[in-house]
Amino acid sequence: KDGKENGQGTHIWTNGNKYVGEFKDSKKHGQGTTTFHDDGTTYIGEFKDDEMHGQGTNTYANGDQYVGEFKDGKKHGQGTFTWTDGDKYVGEFKDDLKHGQGTYTMANGTVGKGIWENDELVEPN
């Protein structure tokens, strides 16, 4: 419509990055999957205006994984980040950082629980 991509489709960029999913006005919008060619990172979930937005799963090339909410392309809201070394954080994120109520459990069993601000535990409980 008007020369813009709308509906289901696939777009492969010259750098090898690939998106399969819904488009609105030539932007990623709705459900889709993006694969980044340079390192194999994938995102499966919701998009809005070309950005990860809503519920999704981001699996990084090294195996780390985030499952949860995104806003404007960043981890934002409730989510779980699991590192390949066995560490796990379950809680709130803001602008890609641990921020709000959350629990960080290390692979060795050590637990940090409480209020987080800008990736730091500031009020343990």
PLM region descriptions:
Residues 1-6, 18-29, 42-53, 65-76, ...:
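Conserved anchor residues at repeat-unit boundaries in beta-strand-based tandem repeats, strongest
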Residues 5, 10-14, 33-35, 57-61, ...:
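Threonine-centered tandem repeat motifs in low-complexity domains
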Residues 123-125:
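Short, solvent-exposed mixed-charge patches
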